[in-house]
Amino acid sequence: MLLTLIRDTFTPSETLGKLYIDRKFFCDTIEPPVVPNAQHPKGCIPLGWYKLQLSVSPKFGRLLPLLYLVPGFQGIRIHAGNNRDHTSGCILVGELYHRHGVPGTTCCGGESGGIGRFNERGAVSLCDPIVERGVPTLCHSKLTEQALVDKLKNETNQHEELYINITDTDRYPVERAILDGMSNLADCK
């Protein structure tokens, strides 16, 4: 299963994008701004391919996707939030009411605009198609990210693996052409 996040709007205060599941649009995203050579919490995570795992978040107390082996970052989750101030380095999912600095959009309130309709539904509904595909779930809320990575390395996984490709509008057409030529996602490793 492949999630693709395409970043398409960059401002000094936030990065906006669109999240796709197996190339079908799923929702909008908000992340921290792009900061060259960023280390959490200054900017968003670097472009690239990352493995995902569903696990119970100690902070939120429910099943959420966790990106792991992200250079310079730990505990990067995909979860709901209302605006860029709620990212803490994570990827917020929802439906954008306002694309900051983009003419012709509607602001839902506040200078930063916001993301709505996903306060409780967003990340939970993102988990639904993942669980339906048989991707394994870790329900160990007390595991650190390193313990989670170690556990995953030691398990033989016969289930479908979950990846996220974080890219931008300049790189995506080339990546898509490459993916179209591959027989399966395992070729990406």
Q: Where is each model-derived feature located?
A:
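Cell wall/extracellular polymer interaction/catalysis modules
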Residues: M1-C188
